[in-house]
Structure formats: structure tokens, C-alpha cells
């Protein structure tokens, strides 16, 4: 298995496509090897879950507000009916400083809609230093394809 030894093929395809869909074995291990190989090649890596991502561009690059989950009937006296808004720093704020390329690895990518996945591809096109890897589910062996190719099927 030369891929697990070097990761060059994956890195080459990631650099050319910008946005990759990965199907990894459910036992785990393959994705962490690839992340380690990418870090060794000079990439900054950020691992995150795709659940609750919202608007990808705002969540990744801009300061944005979040609200607590709705917990049923509550008194309106403590705040607005929608709850208190808290400001959160962007996920990739610190990672995008400098000149190093950044890989965002999203777990549980199968919960994202087609429009959210295409928005991630557009982000990679607009910001050439950003590369996105989305885990789209499990497979018997590690395989990947460009996310645009997956969306066109």
C-alpha cells in the first residue's frame, strides 16, 4: 500500500482539485495517517465536524453569532425570545495567517446538502491556499474523488 506510506498521490490530487470527497474505512486510522502526511508536507490542518456548520463562508472566515439551542418554554424576562447571541471567532481565523496552505478536514460530511458542498468547492476556488477534505461516509478501503465530480453524479 504505497499510499499509506507516502500520501503523495492523495496530496497531488488534493492540490489539483482543491476539494476532495473521502470514503474511509469505519475502523479509522487511514485519515489520521493522511493528516500526518499532509502536516509533514507543510500544510496546516484543521479537523472539524460538518454538523452545525451553517453557512460555510461565514463559519470559516468571519466573526459570527450563535444562539443557544431552544430548550422549550423559558421565561422571556432574561433575554429576547430567540436567546442571547454570542459572538464566535471564525474556525480558520488563526490558520489562515501566514503563507502556509491550510487543509480543513470535515468529518460526517454526508449531512451536508449539495449546496453546502458546492459552497465549499467555491471557497477553495476563491482562496487558493485552502484545501477541503470532506468525509462522505465509510468504505471497505480508503478511496477519494474530487468533490465536484461527486456532485456532478
UniProtKB/Swiss-Prot annotation:
The reaction(s) annotated as catalysed by this protein in its Swiss-Prot or TrEMBL entry are: a plastoquinone + NADH + (n+1) H(+)(in) = a plastoquinol + NAD(+) + n H(+)(out); a plastoquinone + NADPH + (n+1) H(+)(in) = a plastoquinol + NADP(+) + n H(+)(out)
| Enzyme Commission number(s) | 7.1.1.-
How does this chain sit within the bilayer?
Peripheral membrane protein
Q: Which UniProt keywords apply?
A: Membrane, NAD, NADP, Plastoquinone, Quinone, Thylakoid, Translocase, Transport
* Single GO MF annotation: oxidoreductase activity, acting on NAD(P)H, quinone or similar compound as acceptor
Any one GO CC term of this protein is: plasma membrane-derived thylakoid membrane
Subunit structure, as described in the record = NDH-1 can be composed of about 15 different subunits; different subcomplexes with different compositions have been identified which probably have different functions.
Chain's role: NDH-1 shuttles electrons from an unknown electron donor, via FMN and iron-sulfur (Fe-S) centers, to quinones in the respiratory and/or the photosynthetic chain. The immediate electron acceptor for the enzyme in this species is believed to be plastoquinone. Couples the redox reaction to proton translocation, and thus conserves the redox energy in a proton gradient. Cyanobacterial NDH-1 also plays a role in inorganic carbon-concentration.
Which protein is depicted? NAD(P)H-quinone oxidoreductase subunit N
What is the primary gene name for this protein? ndhN
